[in-house]
Amino acid sequence: HRGAITGMGIPRGVTLIVGGGYHGKSTLLKALELGVYDHIAGDGREYVITDATAVKIRAEDGRSIQNTDISMFINDLPNGKDTAHFSTEDASGSTSQAANVVEAMEAGTSLLLMDEDTSATNFMIRDALMQRVIHREMEPITPFIDRVGELYKIHGVSTIMVAGSSGAYFHVADHIIQMDHYVPRDITGLAKEEARAFPLDSAPLPPAKGPDFGRCPRTSPAFRGSERVKCKVLGRDGVSLNRETIDLRYVEQLADAEQSAALGCCLLYAQKRLLDGKRN
């Protein structure tokens, strides 16, 4: 209710945040990921406003994945596992990050927020030398750099990403912001001009199949035949339902233990009233 304000708007598309170490790249991303909330007056972030559907994505080694289609990023695994219906109790960095992206899309996100510091390197990029030594047909991982433009153009999902070590994303970014002593400035033209001297050594890929919006979740075995299900809140880090722990440590947009409690209650309600293996 304070009238018009001025500032830097980040357009839809693929946006890269770059800059030297300790110049504020991750700080800006952190402000954006918490911009899905209203802030108290005087907080300093009142006008950092982010798309309400924005999801922070990171690698999450060891997480569980159940029947998720990660074939957009992972295919032809040596063990023969079907990546269109992928399940594991101990995901790697790349498979966990692939699943996190796909699940966010299934949930209806329009914006992914990523930081290279918390991402799996082999999920994000493969440099030219590695591609020459390990040919594409021998590599089951399609790196995010090969899909990020497609996510926006075909699926309407934008990406804002922090990068400090590789300039490869200059080629696919629509907008490039440099943080200089905590001050952002648009260097898209400069970065694109410099990138022309370092062309990407990769051929365009055909579009991948999008996420499955018709999945029909089934009730967890931990709830079957149980009338009284105990829900224990483990602070902001997670909840325990019938002694099955749901680890929320890497869901970085959660800000309070009460949110963990609310999520536990939502899961209990869904398990008892909604999940029947027939409805999506």
Language-model features and meaning:
Residues K153-G156, V162-N280:
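Conserved NTP phosphate-binding and transfer environment spanning the P-loop NTPase/kinase superfamily
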Residues L16, L34, D38-G42, E103, ...:
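Conserved helix-loop functional segments at active or binding sites
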Residues R63, S71-S94, I125-I141:
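Flexible beta-alpha connector loops of hexameric P-loop NTPases
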Residues I5-Y37:
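Glycine-rich phosphate-binding P-loop
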Residues G35-N75:
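AAA+/P-loop NTPase substrate/partner-engagement loops
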Residues S92-A104:
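Conserved alpha-helical scaffold flanking the Walker A/P-loop in AAA+ ATPase domains
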Residues A104-V148, Y152-K153, V162-K192:
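Conserved P-loop NTPase nucleotide-binding/switch module
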